[in-house]
Amino acid sequence: MTDNAPRIHPTAVIDPAARLADDVQVGAFTLIGADVEIGAGTVVGPHCSIHGPTRIGRDNRFVGHAAIGGEPQDKKFAGERTELVIGDRNVFREFVTVNRGTGGGGGITTIGNDNWMLAYTHVAHDCHVGNFCVFSNNTTLAGHVTVGDYVIISGFAGAHQFCRIGAHAFLGMGALTNGDVPPFTMVGTDSLGRPRGINSEGLKRRGFDAERISAIKRAYRTLYVAGLPLAEAKQQLTEQARGSDDVKAMLDFIEHAERPLLR
């Protein structure tokens, strides 16, 4: 698209009730429905569909064939008003799908800032994704999944409904988790993913020093290597958390579980 070309392709269909910032670009054959709000600097590529109620922040990029804000894939959904809220500077690659929430699940799906969602990623109804995450090709989140900041999910990996994935966690290629994944943890590629240590390389890249990583490793060994019952492991983590905010974050995550902890 040149500087002199129209920012909205003539084949795009935009509902009069949609609200787009002046500099939003919309590609060929894209559909933008009513009650959609798109912030400044956002680029919507060709053959995309965005349905409302959906709120999209600034400087996002939707590559071809992304389907955003569609109805939840939940038989209990009865047409009630629900929404999708997306923050700033996210990238949605080819054929990504993100669904709105359900009335019974809180009514909202949220995506934070600075996330990369690669081709064929699916984010289901009532999910909540933090900031600076990378979802590789064919990542699948079932309904009501919560993902913390800086999570990396490898290709063809997925999470069972209602699972939580803690900040800085890493899921390997094809890993499927049916339980909560504590912060900093790596999940292997078994038929159902199992913890395989902490995400040391990712933490180093984000500026965690040796002392912080050592404390996280100690907590991981307490939780997964020592063979302790969960209640006893939590007691030891409580002691360790007094000297480490990172261990405290792990303990807080465990204390607020809705699904069984992945062990």
UniProtKB/Swiss-Prot annotation:
E.C. code: 2.3.1.129
Similarity section: Belongs to the transferase hexapeptide repeat family. LpxA subfamily.
Main location: cytoplasm
Catalytic activity: a (3R)-hydroxyacyl-[ACP] + UDP-N-acetyl-alpha-D-glucosamine = a UDP-3-O-[(3R)-3-hydroxyacyl]-N-acetyl-alpha-D-glucosamine + holo-[ACP]
GO MF term (any one): acyl-[acyl-carrier-protein]-UDP-N-acetylglucosamine O-acyltransferase activity
Record's signal peptide: none
Pathway in which the depicted protein is active: Glycolipid biosynthesis; lipid IV(A) biosynthesis; lipid IV(A) from (3R)-3-hydroxytetradecanoyl-[acyl-carrier-protein] and UDP-N-acetyl-alpha-D-glucosamine: step 1/6
Organism superkingdom: Bacteria
GO BP terms, alphabetized: lipid A biosynthetic process
Gene3D superfamilies to which the protein is assigned, alphabetical: Hexapeptide repeat proteins, Udp N-acetylglucosamine O-acyltransferase, C-terminal domain
The encoding gene: lpxA
Top class in the EC scheme: transferase
Subunit structure: Homotrimer.
SUPFAM superfamilies membership: Trimeric LpxA-like enzymes
Any single Gene Ontology cellular-component annotation: membrane
Phylogenetic classification of the source organism: Bacteria, Pseudomonadati, Pseudomonadota, Gammaproteobacteria, Lysobacterales
Name this protein carries in UniProt: Acyl-[acyl-carrier-protein]--UDP-N-acetylglucosamine O-acyltransferase
Compartments where located: Cytoplasm
Function: Involved in the biosynthesis of lipid A, a phosphorylated glycolipid that anchors the lipopolysaccharide to the outer membrane of the cell.
Entry keywords, A to Z: Acyltransferase, Cytoplasm, Lipid A biosynthesis, Lipid biosynthesis, Lipid metabolism, Repeat, Transferase
